[in-house]
Amino acid sequence: MAISRAQLAKELEPGLNALFGMEYGRYENQHSEIYTTESSDRAFEEEVMLSGFGAAPVKQEGSGVSFDDANESFTARYNHETIALAFAITEEAVEDNLYDRISARYTRELARSMAHTKQVKAAAVLNNAFDSTVTGGDGKELCATDHPLITGGTFANEPSVAADLNETSLEDALISIAGFVDERGLKIALRGTKLIIPRQLQFTAERLMSSVLRPATSDNDVNALRSMGMLPQGYTVNDFLTDTDAFFIMTDTPRGFLHFERTPLSTNMEADFDTGNMRYKARERYSFGFSDPRCVFGSPGA
């Protein structure tokens, strides 16, 4: 359906002081604080988790050396989605509007809608982090207490008891990250790099990260998180997170949160010969997801 003069009646009359409602600022590219962006030329992308060797055993004198096998553990798949939106304007609405270039106004609004959807899609990975029906390559949700290992054991990137963001829960999470193991149970050197929080926790995060002394105590102890340089990239607020007390710590895992761009954002405009309507369309294709769940440690909040 095209935007017609009936929908813009006030803009056809002289004496209108202002048009408003579409001049708000917008949250842009918050996904870049979390995701590494790569291009794609396929309908989907797959990444395979490899399993290396276990700990080397002792070889007894005169005995044969032990052999080990390498395997593929699981596959993470990124299915690209097509995101598109369009609008049309009648010839008469364009001709009779007295106040601005109506097409330019709604083209800007089209870009705003596309940008909003991208941020919602990016945040959905974290918003679904504790949902057992939304799983990654290993068959578990992003944050779980029982991610399976190929050796038969498990590892956890979620606390066994859900906790709110505070000094203790943050320190416990960083300790847990330092204890992560690979698919064969070997210790790996990972560290927390950045805290991801909803807007409701930004003041708590600032006190935890920036106070010289321990926050919320009368002790004269140093703030260990600050003095030890933990979380070197600080914290970032994501305004599209829906859980008001969940928090996440990103790690320096090589293949973690990924954003694949299949088709960059493009806009098109054409005239309909029969009606004279002008039609405008925006379209892009992309996917958001994660490969290695060791890329994050998350708590849903108490």
Regions found by a protein language model. Give the residues of each.
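Assembly/oligomerization interface modules of large self-assembling protein complexes
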Residues: 25-83
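Long, contiguous amphipathic alpha-helices that act as assembly "spine/axial" helices in icosahedral shell
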Residues: 75-133, 195, 280-282
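Generic structural "secondary-structure junction" signal
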Residues: 80, 96, 128, 136, ...
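N-terminal alpha-helical "arm" segments
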Residues: 1-27
